[in-house]
Amino acid sequence: MVAFRFVYIPLPFFFFFFFFFVFFSGVSQLQDQTATKKSVRILSKILIGDDGRVYACSDNDFFSFESNGSIAWSVHMNFKCNTDFAPVYSGFNQMLLLAENRILRVIFPRNGTKSEPELFFDPGETILGFAVSVSSSSVYITVKNHGLYAYNMFRQQLWIAEPKIERFGYRLGCRKDFDNCTFNSRPVIDSCEGSIYISNNEGELYSLSLRGTYYQWIQDFSLVDRFFTVTPGNNGLVYVVFPIKSLVFALDSFSGDILWQKTIGPLAETSASDPVIDSNSWASIGSLDGTLYSFSRTGDLYKIPKNAETDSVIQIEPLLDCSGYAVYVSQTKFEGMIDRVIEDYTYVSAKKPETAVFSLVVPETRSIYWSQSYSDQIPGLLLDEDLQHFVLDERIALAFVAASSSGNPFRCRSKHEKLSSSCSFAEPEHLDIYIGNERAIIWFLLFEFVIMVLFAALVRFCFIFWKKKKLQDRPFSTFLDKRRLLHRKSREIDKTITRLQNESTANESAVDKIGDLIQKRENVKRKLSSTYSLGRDIDESKSKLKDYVLPLYGGSSRSFSYRNRENESITIFQTPSDESSSEESYRDEHYDDVADDEHDEDDLDRKQKGKLLAHSEGSSNDGDGIASSRRSIYLKHIFDD
């Protein structure tokens, strides 16, 4: 495999003067070069906030710049800041930064009142880097030769993690040199997965949980190279870049499996090899061949532009715009570029830079929305004169271009909105489980639903059924025997009524018998639908009032009406009297009492038959007038068979 290494060979003292004259058009030339070096300060790496301001530190001061380069406010510190690390936003209008192996907390001014930076963490050892999780309000710090420390915002230690792990007698990390193995990189946080990624000096990459020292997976890259950079995609992927080998790996953030790998152009051996991931889940990285390489989640590669000029390089990492959909890229054209292959490395050399080109690119569509070239002067930047006190290289200039949204047609979004957009791409593709025939599963679920509904109905029926009065302290078999007896009686009464109706004679005795049988059948049906039903008990007093209707009496005459079996209607009107009413009421009550006796059904039939016979004889011996005075039957019944 052919690797690349960029070696920049400028003319003596030319590099400094080029950037000084290119980015300071309004500053006159100084006579003494030594005095010029003493008058300027070097800014640390840049952080662009959601408010559009640029945050950086220099020497013992922390600065907040407006997008035009003017200083919004500054805070003096007691320690000199480390320019290799950018400030980190920690929430609640606070910043954390590294200064002389100490982490300081800078609080934004309130109502014009500034507060001095406070010491957040001082291990007394070398700090390799730190990261902040705003969602969990925690800070994760890598201390050289010690491990990974987790602190909350109240400076309370949560836990400590080390690369040496032994579980059940097995080593999970540091397999080659267990004694001298240490973490040697700064931690990076995957906000979507809630994970921390950190590597050791043996080329192993760890994935830890934010909540504790739970190691999710360990991937060994020692066979590829021990020097690599890690960038969380916040989209279900982790990007591992090997600058010397010019390789890009995409790992599953859940399992650590390698999904794909690509070879790109030569990269600078600095942090400029870190890719930037936009909200469309495209990872972009600049190369020394002047090309912007963009990868989709599935590994599709776009080169922007397709045919890059051979005298251009991209030596600083692109910056994400405020919308999250585009990136700002800086290309530098050099005079006399030469590349040579020596053994496994490609060396690129150049004489002097000529032009810097800033562009706004959307990797997903390969569209260039804005581009501006600067040579000797940069009138288009319109930067404030406050920046004349600092060294303004193309890294700083690109940061202010991105902060001012130069040529950007997209709406700016907050960091939370951009993170939510990218996290939506983190689909659980690793859960590849065979679930069988979906159609069969749907039918099975439907069948289960029907069974559950039927079971619920059965439970409800049983709950209502066992609350019946006839089942309280009585055997269930007695209840069933009574139901069968009542059904048999109902059928016998129907047969008797049919036989009497089919007889040609319609005398008074037959009418009385039919009336009694109809009333008896109604009582049987009432019991089957209430006390001996399979449902809840019904209040019989209400049903009686609802079923019986008082007849209309217009004299002493009687009225009899018969119809055929298919559509039967019987209407009986007789003259009421006090004596007959009391006698009939007593007979009805006696009938109900005997009918409720569940232990002597034969006696019930015998009493009813004897009473019916005695009543029929009394009606035959008496005259029509006597019978009408002693009998009181108020019945109107209509039924259809």
Swiss-Prot record:
Which organism was this protein described from? Arabidopsis thaliana (Mouse-ear cress)
What is this protein called in UniProt?
Answer: Protein GAMETE EXPRESSED 3
Query: Per the record's keyword annotation, is Methyltransferase included, yes or no?
Result: no
Tissue distribution is: Expressed in mature siliques and in pollen, mainly in the sperm cells. Detected in the egg cell within the female gametophyte.
Q: What is its main location?
A: membrane
Q: Which UniProt keywords apply?
A: Cell membrane, Membrane, Signal, Transmembrane, Transmembrane helix
Q: Which SUPFAM superfamilies match?
A: Quinoprotein alcohol dehydrogenase-like
- Where is this chain compositionally biased, Basic and acidic residues type? 584-593
- Localization per Swiss-Prot or TrEMBL: Cell membrane
TM ranges: 441-461
User: What is the membrane topology noted in the UniProt record heading this document?
Assistant: Single-pass membrane protein
Report the InterPro entries cross-referenced here.
GEX3-like, Quinoprotein_ADH-like_sf, WD40/YVTN_repeat-like_dom_sf
Acidic residues: which segments have biased composition? 594-603
Question: Which is a Gene Ontology cellular component entry for this protein?
Answer: secretory vesicle
Q: Its Gene Ontology biological processes?
A: embryo development ending in seed dormancy; pollen tube guidance
Renumbered to this chain, the signal peptide range is 1-29
The record's region (Disordered) falls at 570-627
Keyword Amino-acid biosynthesis on entry: no
Q: What does this protein do?
A: Required for micropylar pollen tube guidance. Plays a role during early embryo patterning.
